[in-house]
């Protein structure tokens, strides 16, 4: 079946819209679909996403499509950019409408709610083994990507041909550099764990601990990510790249990050509900914390920072008490004996 569009993007929030803008700015005919018909009508009329990316006009190659069936019929390349807690339900909605030659890539960062399973497992459960799968991950703020500021990300998947073609489709010499990676598991993990650590970095700064503490937390957070990744069969090299260290540093140090701002509010004394309300958009790290904590327990992996953040978010522990517990942990070597 011939494509009438180069790619269809499912998810018209800030990040989905930003990726659609980037693709269309590169000359690719891009369809953008979202679940709210009224929102999609507004996007079509305004030719920008005023709610999430105000003032950034849509390129001519970006088209709004409110009908999911038409959106999925237009292209075999489907980019899913929705919150992790609705990832499975969106795939289930799309499944009967997918083309036989469809290929699925997602930029969703997170794990399955409650179970902590990787999104690849959710996708396979919903879609079966028929479709090639891939994931995008890396240090990207939606606004900067949409504005065309230089950005770099990584892509990995189940099919090398699909991965290579995604690199070509997404890459733009002026705005977006895309690195191929063969670590499908590592890219998925990095995007979830960094959200958790960013909340911790925000809490540390909100308490007033300063740059030394923030840097220590980021560094030990990277250790936790690597430890979990190794247990799941990921490559440690991945966590030194865009989807690991890159995304972790970005999200932990810049206030464009909702997760960091959420942590800041908690560190300054807000309760969880008030802090979430202040952000006004989905704080992926809130759910990610429970997901990562669940996965770590199931795998028997020690993640003390993640555990303390979990206790703050879900058990009412004070951020300062969590910090004190981390600081009072038993002394240990940074380079354990092999």
Swiss-Prot record:
Alphabetized UniProt keyword annotations: Cytoplasm, Lipid biosynthesis, Lipid metabolism, NAD, NADP, Nucleotide-binding, Oxidoreductase, Phospholipid biosynthesis, Phospholipid metabolism
SUPFAM superfamilies cross-referenced by the UniProt entry: 6-phosphogluconate dehydrogenase C-terminal domain-like, NAD(P)-binding Rossmann-fold domains
Residues annotated as the enzyme's active site: 194
GO biological process, one term: glycerol-3-phosphate catabolic process
Pfam families recorded: NAD_Gly3P_dh_C, NAD_Gly3P_dh_N
Pathway: Membrane lipid metabolism; glycerophospholipid metabolism
GO cellular component: cytosol
GO MF term set: glycerol-3-phosphate dehydrogenase [NAD(P)+] activity; NAD binding
Catalysed reactions, semicolon-separated: sn-glycerol 3-phosphate + NAD(+) = dihydroxyacetone phosphate + NADH + H(+); sn-glycerol 3-phosphate + NADP(+) = dihydroxyacetone phosphate + NADPH + H(+)
Keyword NADP attached: yes
Keyword Lipid biosynthesis: yes
Residues annotated to bind NADPH: 14-15, 35, 109, 142, 258, 282, 284
InterPro entries given in the database record: 6-PGluconate_DH-like_C_sf, 6PGD_dom2, G3P_DH_NAD-dep, G3P_DH_NAD-dep_C, G3P_DH_NAD-dep_N, NAD(P)-bd_dom_sf
Locations listed in the record: Cytoplasm
Primary localization class, coarse: cytoplasm
Binding site for sn-glycerol 3-phosphate: 109, 138, 140, 194, 247, 257-259
This enzyme's EC code(s): 1.1.1.94
Ranges that cross the membrane: none
Top EC class, one word: oxidoreductase
Role of this protein: Catalyzes the reduction of the glycolytic intermediate dihydroxyacetone phosphate (DHAP) to sn-glycerol 3-phosphate (G3P), the key precursor for phospholipid synthesis.
Protein family according to the UniProt entry: Belongs to the NAD-dependent glycerol-3-phosphate dehydrogenase family.
PANTHER family found in the cross-reference section: GLYCEROL-3-PHOSPHATE DEHYDROGENASE, GLYCEROL-3-PHOSPHATE DEHYDROGENASE [NAD(+)] 2, CHLOROPLASTIC
Protein name: Glycerol-3-phosphate dehydrogenase [NAD(P)+]
